[in-house]
């Protein structure tokens, strides 16, 4: 997706009856030293075999999960030279954003000096588990998914990479929504940037960046809480604690429901303004 204009599909999704329940933050489980695998606390589609009982959210989640499960590893990654343009340098010598194809090319990873790889996607698995340090976090590219809950783990991993003098590659499937949202949030946290400035910086390096509507709203709300002082950035443990203390309805539908209720109670108009 390369357009920066509002996406009609996403606008339509906001009007449809999603159904979503979000649990607490995802905590990494015990895993081999080279790979940290997190538990999936995102909402699961119903096991009800009758499609007529599925909400829109459940039906969409079922399709997305089926696609994720069916994605087989590529028999051979494209040539490193052909992929160089897909490796977007966000912070020189520290942070790179890309699609999954860059991660599949050990030749290009070595050329880029990559030492750590942050995978943001349920369908993604390490291609070179013995050669690079991985953190793999399961999340779907859906508006109702809670990406804020992943941020403390992501930030800690990125800090560890930089403290060791390494270069971290952050990627999802296409390097457009999930991984881009994490990188934008990381710049907000480390550089003290507002959301719009961090997003603009990432887009200058990678013009195709386009977080889905739910992730955008979550990051905007996170920025608002940061500016108000409700959330203290601090170190990652402080951030995780602060996020838990000021728990928000991070997913899109609960966010809209809460804001509309607040508008009704306080007598102001909630226009669902979204900067994209």
Curated annotation (Swiss-Prot):
Description of what induces expression: By oxidative stress.
Pfam families to which the protein is assigned, alphabetical: DSPc
Bias (Basic and acidic residues) ranges: 7-18, 41-52
Segments for region (Disordered): 1-52
Start and end residues of each Tyrosine-protein phosphatase domain: 86-228
Record-listed E.C. numbers: 3.1.3.16, 3.1.3.48
SMART domains referenced in this protein's UniProt entry, alphabetically: DSPc
GO MF terms held by the record: JUN kinase phosphatase activity; protein serine/threonine phosphatase activity; protein tyrosine phosphatase activity
Keywords: Hydrolase, Protein phosphatase, Stress response
Family: Belongs to the protein-tyrosine phosphatase family. Non-receptor class dual specificity subfamily.
Annotated protein name in UniProt: Dual specificity protein phosphatase
């Amino acid at each position: 997706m390369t357009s920066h204009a509002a996406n009609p599909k996403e606008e339509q999704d906001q009007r449809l009856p999603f159904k979503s329940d979000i649990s607490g933050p995802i905590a990494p489980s015990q895993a081999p030293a080279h790979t940290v695998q997190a538990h999936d606390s995102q909402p699961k589609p119903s096991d009800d075999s009758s499609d007529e009982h599925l909400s829109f959210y459940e039906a969409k989640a079922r399709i997305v999960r089926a696609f994720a499960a069916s994605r087989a590893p590529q028999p051979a990654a494209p040539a490193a030279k052909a992929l160089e343009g897909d490796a977007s340098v966000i912070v020189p010598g520290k942070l790179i954003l890309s699609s999954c194809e860059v991660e599949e090319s050990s030749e290009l990873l070595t050329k880029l000096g990559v030492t750590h790889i942050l995978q943001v996607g349920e369908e993604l698995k390490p291609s070179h588990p013995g050669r690079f340090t991985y953190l793999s976090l399961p999340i779907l590219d859906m508006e109702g998914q809670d990406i804020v809950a992943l941020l403390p783990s992501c930030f800690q991993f990125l800090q560890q990479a930089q403290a060791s003098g390494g270069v971290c590659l952050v990627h999802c499937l296409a390097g457009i929504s999930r991984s881009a949202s994490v990188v934008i949030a990381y710049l907000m946290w480390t550089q003290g940037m507002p959301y719009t400035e961090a997003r603009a910086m990432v887009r200058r390096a990678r013009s195709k960046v386009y977080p889905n509507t739910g992730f955008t709203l979550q990051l905007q709300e996170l920025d608002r809480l940061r500016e108000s002082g409700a959330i203290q950035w601090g170190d990652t443990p402080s951030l995780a604690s602060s996020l838990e203390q000021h728990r928000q309805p991070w997913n899109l539908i609960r966010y809209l429901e809460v804001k509309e209720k607040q508008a009704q109670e306080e007598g102001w108009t909630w226009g669902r303004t979204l900067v994209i």
